[in-house]
């Protein structure tokens, strides 16, 4: 929903923003970064991740400086876009710079079986499926869509039984014999564990097909099937910088009462994070084999700190996003925005960790493209880990790429329908 601003107020706001930017005294770049960061914290009323001055363009720094001062700051209070992108703010708050969607409009081809959306490790507001995703899938695509909200910060061994209970409820409610699962982040591992012969069926001592026969397909989005180094660092298993700082950054991202004490002392949190480590992934994948009769497919997300382009990164992106049938896998990228997704500021501290210090490695801030592949790889979407769920504070269409996440989900379901699922 776009905020309504009187034209005269808009003129005054823009005049103040331009005037403040033009009159700013010369200062060292590092000092300016620190000042802008402090202003953003005060303006938005919530902490922003630290700005990487070396990776922030002068133009973006100018925009952030302008948006954190005077009347513009007042307009941002309480409604600032969660990604920190000045272009997103201009579109959502002022109606300036908005772009048309390049994501194809969904066809109204309902799936044969209901679609169940499965959440990731967290259920805080930033990590919930946007209501617009559900409404677009239902209204534009004609799909029956329901949610499976699993306990946050638990392992697949705990969450898969919850998912099975929800599937049984949906089957009873709809009369459908099977469901299609679309699973984000850790939810992808839960979905795989649910139907694997060595997963929930083995835990309960029942026939492997008991759970698998109730699931028609598993589509994972942004799932770290081969682990994410962010989890290794949070658990102190990888020597990347200051462990305490990384934990605090994750607390800012999750919006939860995180602390070094909680991660060190809460066995549930540690177990959930351990499932996502690079160290634990090989054993999980070797044990949790795919179930017969279930379609497995995956999508990866990618984004760039401050939307910055890089020839080395883009070359890797083109290579890694190639789909199983040899297509580019980047169909959602070329469009009106002409650039990369602006990674949410809260994710920026983790992008370098996820990529093991290699800036050319494509990731969504938490999961690399390579780690997100499982089953039939469908390609990459220009969305960071949070934007893959939609964010109520962002424009419906990404201003830099033209990507529409709600249409994307509706099209994923439409593709399942075309496969008879």
Each model region followed by its residue ranges:
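Bacterial N-terminal signal peptides that target proteins for export
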Residues: 1-13
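C-terminal motif of bacterial Sec signal peptides marking the signal peptidase cleavage site
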Residues: 20-22
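N-terminal non-catalytic accessory region
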Residues: 88-241, 384-403, 407-421
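Mature extracellular/luminal domains of secreted and GPI-anchored eukaryotic proteins, especially small
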Residues: 28-96
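Residue-level detector of intrinsically disordered terminal segments
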Residues: 12, 16-17, 342
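Short, solvent-exposed loop/turn elements at domain surfaces
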Residues: 41-46, 123-128, 228, 304-310
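Bacterial signal peptide processing site
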Residues: 24-26
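Helical cap/lid subdomain of alpha/beta-hydrolase-fold lipid enzymes
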Residues: 209-421
């Amino acid at each position: 929903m776009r905020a309504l601003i009187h034209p005269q107020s808009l003129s005054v706001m823009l005049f103040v923003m331009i005037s403040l930017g033009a009159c700013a005294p010369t200062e060292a770049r590092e000092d300016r970064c620190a000042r802008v960061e402090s202003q953003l914290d005060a303006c938005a009323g919530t902490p922003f991740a630290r700005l990487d001055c070396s990776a922030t363009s002068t133009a973006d720094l100018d925009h952030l400086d302008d948006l954190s001062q005077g009347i513009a700051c007042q307009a941002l209070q309480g409604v600032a876009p969660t990604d920190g992108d000045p272009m997103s703010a201009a579109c959502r708050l002022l109606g300036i710079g908005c772009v048309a969607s390049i994501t194809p409009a969904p066809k109204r081809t309902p799936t044969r079986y209901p679609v169940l959306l499965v959440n990731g490790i967290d259920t805080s507001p930033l990590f919930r499926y946007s209501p617009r995703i559900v409404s677009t899938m239902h209204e534009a695509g004609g799909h029956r869509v329901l949610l499976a909200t699993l306990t946050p910060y638990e392992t697949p061994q705990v969450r898969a039984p919850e998912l099975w209970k929800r599937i049984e409820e949906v089957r009873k409610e709809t009369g459908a014999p099977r469901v299609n699962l679309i699973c984000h982040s850790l939810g992808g591992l839960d979905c795989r564990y649910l139907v694997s012969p060595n997963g929930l069926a083995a835990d309960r001592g029942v026939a492997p097909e008991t759970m698998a026969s109730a699931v028609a397909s598993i589509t994972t989005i942004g799932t770290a099937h081969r682990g994410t180094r962010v989890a290794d660092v949070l658990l102190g298993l990888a020597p990347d910088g200051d462990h305490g700082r990384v934990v605090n950054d994750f607390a800012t991202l999750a919006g939860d009462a995180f602390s070094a004490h909680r991660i060190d002392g809460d066995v549930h949190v540690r177990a959930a994070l351990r499932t996502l480590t690079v160290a634990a992934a090989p054993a999980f994948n070797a044990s949790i084999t795919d179930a017969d009769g279930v379609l497995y497919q995956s999508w990866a997300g990618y984004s760039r700190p401050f939307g910055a382009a890089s020839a080395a990164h883009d070359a890797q992106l083109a290579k890694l996003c190639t789909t199983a049938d040899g297509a580019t896998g980047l169909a959602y990228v070329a469009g009106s925005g002409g650039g990369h997704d602006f990674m949410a500021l809260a994710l920026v501290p983790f992008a370098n960790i996820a990529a093991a210090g290699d800036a050319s490695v494509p990731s969504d801030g938490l999961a690399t493209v390579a780690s997100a592949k499982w089953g039939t790889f469908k390609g990459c979407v220009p969305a960071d880990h949070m934007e893959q769920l939609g964010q109520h504070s962002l424009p419906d269409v990404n201003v830099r790429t033209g990507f529409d996440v709600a249409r994307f989900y509706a099209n994923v379901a439409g593709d399942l329908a075309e496969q008879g699922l």
